[in-house]
Amino acid sequence: MPHIVTIGEALVEVMRTELDRPLNRPAPLVGPYPSGAPAIFCSAAARLGASTGFVGTVGQDPFGDCITSRLTDDGVDIMGVRERQDLLTGIAFVAYASDGSRSFCFHMAQAAASQVDWEQIPDGYLDDVRYLHIMGSALSASQSMRQACYRAARHVSANGGTVTLDPNLRPELLPPDQIRAVCQPILDVAGIVLPSGEELTALTGTATPEAGAEHLLANGIDLVALKRGAEGCTLYTAQESVSIDAYQVQEIDPTGAGDCFDAALIVALGEGWSLATAGLFANAVGGLATTERGPMEGAPFRDAVLAFMADQGRPLPGTEDR
C-alpha cells in the first residue's frame, strides 16, 4: 500500500494563452492538462520517488483518460480512483493577469470530480499510510468528499500516520470566511499545515501570518510551512523558525507550484531530512514547477532537482547534514 495518500478532485485544466484576457470574453485557450490540486500533489511526490496513492473520481471520457494516464505514468497508485459513466470529468478554466493573479471557473459541483466518498477507498488502504495530505479544495467540492476526508484523517491519525493540510483557498469554491469551520476537523488531527500568507490569516483569524503560525503551533500543530511565493518559505515549529530564499526561475505557469512544494517538503521530511534541507529542496521543486505550461508539466524528477540546485550554486547538503 502507498505511504503517501491524498483524497480529492481530479480535473483537466484549460487555460488562457495571453495575460489579461478574462474568461467572459472570447480569447485563445490551451489544454487539456491533467490537474486538480490533490492529483498534482500525488504526481509530484511520485516523481520524487515516493510511494503515493490517489483517491478521486473521473468520467469515462477522454479527459478522465488524460488524468489517469498521467498518474499511472508517474507511478501513482490509482486503486482508489473511480470512473463514472454518467458524469463528465471535471474542468477548470484559468485566466492569468499581468499582476500575477489568477481567476478560475470550475465545472466541478456537477462533474465526476466532486463525487468522492469513503466507500470507494479500498479496505485497508489507509492502515499503513505515513502521510495523508488533505487540500482545502477537496473540503469545498462536496459534502461526500468532505466527509471522506474527515473520516480518512481520523483513521490515519489513529493509526499513527501524519495528517497534513494545505488550505488551498479557492473563493470560487468556498467563501474565505468559511475556511476555519471547514478545515477545523482536519486541524484537530493534523501535524503539518502548508498555507500561503493569505490562507494562514484566514484560517486563524489573525492579523499577520506570523501570528497565525504561532496560533497553530499553540493549538497542537507541529510544523507550519508558510509558502511565500517568489520570496521562498518560512518553516515554523515550537523550537525554531527557518526562512529560506526562493530559487530564481523564469516563470511560465504558477498553477500547481504550491502543490509541488507540498509534495517535496513531505517527501523530504519523510526521509528524515532536516527542516532547512527539506525547505531548500521544496523551494527548488516549487520553482521548477512554474517553468512549464500546465500544472503537472513542470513537476520535476529528483535528479533534475538536484542538478538544478547545484547549477544555481545552492546544492542540496550532503547526507551528513540532513
Put a short name on every predicted segment:
Residues T6-I7, G80, T164-L165, L194-P195, ...:
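General beta-strand structural signal in soluble alpha/beta enzymes
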Residues A45, S196, G258:
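Short, conserved phosphate/pyrophosphate- and ester-handling motifs at nucleotide-, phospho-/glycolipid
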Residues M1-V5, R154-H155, G205-R322:
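Conserved phosphate-binding/catalytic region of the ribokinase-like
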Residues M1-D77, I252, L316, R322:
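Glycine-rich phosphate/adenosyl-contacting loop at the front of the ribokinase-like
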Residues S51-G136, L306-R322:
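Conserved N-terminal subdomain of the carbohydrate kinase-like
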Residues S51-T52, I78, V163, V224, ...:
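Hydrophobic anchor at the start of a short beta-strand
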Residues Y131-E214, E231-C233:
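Conserved beta-alpha-beta core of the PfkB/ribokinase-like small-molecule kinase fold
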